[in-house]
């Protein structure tokens, strides 16, 4: 779960669009999105500290929409760019895992706004990655148990 939550945080604050941004630019975007959404920065910090995924709220979905737009994960029409997200997640997982995690989410562009779609996508990806990690851990445990 920690790896998945950390990935989510990086997905929020790291830029993996066509243009790489500097750490200062990323910090500025994060600050701008926090300010424009009215989001409390402690909520973002708690995601890492407590392994929790925040509940949807107007402020949080506005924050996510701002971050996703600036990262290239959300296009100007408010639709999720799964290709861009996939490129980013490939830095952390193998291609098969990424495809299995993203595939169930792609068919859904659920939400009335880009922010709701960003939230629903993040939630879907985290759920799928957690499931795949648990499955992988179980398979690894089964294999190592048979070898002992």
Specify the residue positions occupied by each region the protein language model found:
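Cleavable N-terminal signal peptides of Sec/SRP-targeted secreted and luminal proteins
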Residues: 2-17
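Mature extracellular/luminal domains of secreted and GPI-anchored eukaryotic proteins, especially small
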Residues: 13-148
């Amino acid at each position: 779960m920690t790896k998945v939550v950390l990935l989510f945080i990086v997905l929020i604050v790291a830029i993996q669009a066509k243009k790489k941004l500097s750490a200062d630019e990323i910090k500025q975007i994060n600050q701008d999105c926090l300010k424009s959404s009215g989001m409390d920065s402690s909520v973002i910090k708690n995601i890492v500290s407590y392994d929790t995924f925040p509940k949807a709220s107007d402020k949080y979905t506005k924050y996510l929409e701002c971050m996703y737009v600036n990262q290239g994960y959300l296009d100007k029409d408010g639709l999720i760019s799964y290709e861009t997200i996939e490129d980013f997640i490939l830095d952390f997982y193998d291609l098969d895992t990424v495809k299995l995690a993203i595939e169930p989410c792609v068919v859904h562009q659920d939400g009335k706004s880009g922010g709701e779609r960003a939230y629903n996508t993040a939630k879907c990806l985290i759920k799928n990655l957690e499931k795949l990690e648990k499955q992988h851990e179980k398979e690894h445990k089964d294999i190592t148990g048979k070898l002992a």
